[in-house]
């Protein structure tokens, strides 16, 4: 490996020299070029170092779990610098991070994160659900924030090894799971608004129960208030960044004060439907042409490209029983469908909640009642089939599951 890297660095120096002579205004640093030519500076799961805690915590009772309050004994940490690339990944005891007060993540939001889960099946085996898709999405978010990217497959393997170490933390329950939170932050100590020259990628694990206080598969009510906007064209609505979430908390509090669980985010003068709080949005209805249709907003930059969303679309298309469409629809469509008894079901989807029925939308002073719980044909079916795959009760596409054990 050392000889290979040395050769690549030599090639890098020669090419850098040539590029500087040919295009002096666009010269490339030799180390950067050598790193591009070699995977040596990328994440390598085979170099993972493990330091085990000497103070393991007791495991919580699955019946008492809420979302995101308990954390396992260890964390995965990877550091990156512009000069050296990725350091060796490390699993260390869970604890506080050390950051300079001027770290760019603290001031300018140079940060992105992901959310995925591991499940303990009825057979006792532990499965990760579509982690490669999550890591590819994280790379997209990182690139948008000028944070470093990484080899998605190698990162999945590092996470798999972390979960294997923490396997006793995966709840023995078919309603609970182990939530996986990878996060990348810019750590450069500078008050200038610039690309970070150093970063940290860490992964923490949390055994979780239902996301909503209403429990598993109980319906939620939504506030649709057009005065608040979550995303806009050319923005970062399709990236998983902390800056997309902090501005939503005020609207969420307004919803809760009115006895509503989530915010339905609208966009544009025609009040297009985009997302539901932490979920993608689905509507099952009889459309204007008299067809049964499952419709969800398109990936136009205004919504997060959800892994659960993609999975539900694939399942529904595989059934081949009704029309499945990704297209724009708005609140007027919802109002007309409910008035004409064409509305059948609405639900949200996401890693945290899986599938969540919607039974009411409060919009412009009016309650719009959604008959999801009276029908449940599609909502319950996609929930049962998806969780069946996640917990190993039924077969799904082969590339959806990564076994931990």
Curated annotation (Swiss-Prot):
Catalytic activity as recorded in UniProt: L-leucine + 2-oxoglutarate = 4-methyl-2-oxopentanoate + L-glutamate; L-isoleucine + 2-oxoglutarate = (S)-3-methyl-2-oxopentanoate + L-glutamate; L-valine + 2-oxoglutarate = 3-methyl-2-oxobutanoate + L-glutamate
Superkingdom in the source lineage: Eukaryota
EC number, UniProt record: 2.6.1.42
GO function term, MF aspect, one: L-leucine-2-oxoglutarate transaminase activity
Purpose of the protein: Catalyzes the first reaction in the catabolism of the essential branched chain amino acids leucine, isoleucine, and valine.
Complex and partners: Homodimer.
PANTHER family: BRANCHED-CHAIN-AMINO-ACID AMINOTRANSFERASE, SUBGROUP IIII AMINOTRANSFERASE
NCBIfam families membership: ilvE_II, PRK13357.1
Name this protein carries in UniProt: Branched-chain-amino-acid aminotransferase
């Amino acid at each position: 490996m050392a000889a290979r890297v040395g050769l690549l660095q030599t090639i890098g120096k020669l090419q850098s020299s040539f590029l500087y002579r040919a295009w002096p205004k666009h010269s490339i640093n030799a180390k950067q070029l050598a790193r591009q030519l070699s995977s040596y500076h990328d994440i390598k799961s085979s170099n993972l170092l493990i330091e085990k805690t000497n103070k393991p915590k007791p495991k919580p009772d699955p019946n008492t779990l809420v979302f995101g309050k308990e954390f396992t004994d260890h964390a995965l940490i990877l550091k990156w610098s512009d000069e050296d690339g990725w350091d060796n990944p490390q699993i260390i005891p869970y604890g506080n991070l050390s950051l300079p007060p001027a770290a760019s993540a603290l001031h300018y939001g140079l940060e992105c994160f992901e959310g995925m889960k591991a499940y303990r099946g009825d057979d006792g085996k532990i499965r990760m659900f579509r982690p490669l898709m999550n890591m590819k999405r994280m790379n997209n978010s990182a690139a948008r924030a000028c944070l470093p990217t990484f080899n998605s497959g190698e990162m999945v393997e590092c996470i798999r090894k972390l979960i294997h170490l923490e396997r006793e933390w995966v709840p023995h329950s078919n309603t609970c799971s182990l939530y996986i939170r990878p996060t990348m932050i810019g750590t450069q100590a500078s008050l200038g608004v610039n690309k970070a020259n150093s970063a940290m990628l860490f992964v923490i694990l949390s055994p979780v129960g239902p996301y909503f206080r209403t429990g598993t598969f109980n319906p939620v009510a939504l506030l649709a208030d057009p005065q608040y906007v979550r995303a806009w064209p050319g923005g970062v609505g399709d990236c998983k960044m902390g800056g997309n979430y902090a501005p939503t908390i005020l609207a969420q509090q307004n919803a809760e004060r009115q006895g509503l669980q989530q915010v339905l985010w609208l966009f544009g003068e025609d009040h297009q439907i985009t997302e539901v709080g932490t979920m993608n949005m689905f509507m099952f209805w009889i459309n204007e042409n008299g067809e049964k249709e499952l419709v969800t907003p398109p990936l136009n930059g205004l919504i997060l490209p959800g892994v659960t969303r993609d999975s539900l679309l694939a399942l529904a298309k595989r059934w081949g029983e009704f029309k499945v469409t990704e297209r724009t629809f708005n609140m007027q469509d919802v109002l007309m469908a409910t008035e004409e008894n064409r509305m059948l079901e609405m639900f949200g989807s996401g890693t945290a909640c899986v599938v969540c029925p919607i039974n009411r939308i409060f919009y412009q002073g009016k309650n719009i009642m959604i008959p999801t719980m009276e029908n449940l044909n599609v909502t319950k079916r996609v929930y049962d089939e998806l969780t069946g795959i996640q917990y190993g009760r039924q077969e799904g596409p082969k590339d959806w599951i990564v076994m931990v054990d």
